[in-house]
Amino acid sequence: MSSAGQSNAVIHHEDDNVAIAVRPVESGEAVVVKAEERVKAAEDVDVGHKIALCSIASGGIVYRYGEPIVEATQAIGAGAWVHVHNTRPIPGDVEA
């Protein structure tokens, strides 16, 4: 569990709607970024994985580094793990 004020996730850009876990985060644990509680984790999230900071509608875009990275394939609740099981490449995106 996170100590009061101790960050367990990072956000790379102010427009991001996901945080990245810097250590494993347990279901029900506060997701803390720069000493500010953002959401409660809806499920266990491993280090390096994304956590939704707000609800993301099906078809909504996930932003990291202020850039669109994937599209939600289903509604993703605040605090949920964001990964390949609930996202896909943005239609029309071409990989370099």
What spans do the regions from the language model cover?
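N-terminal small-residue-enriched
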Residues: 2-96
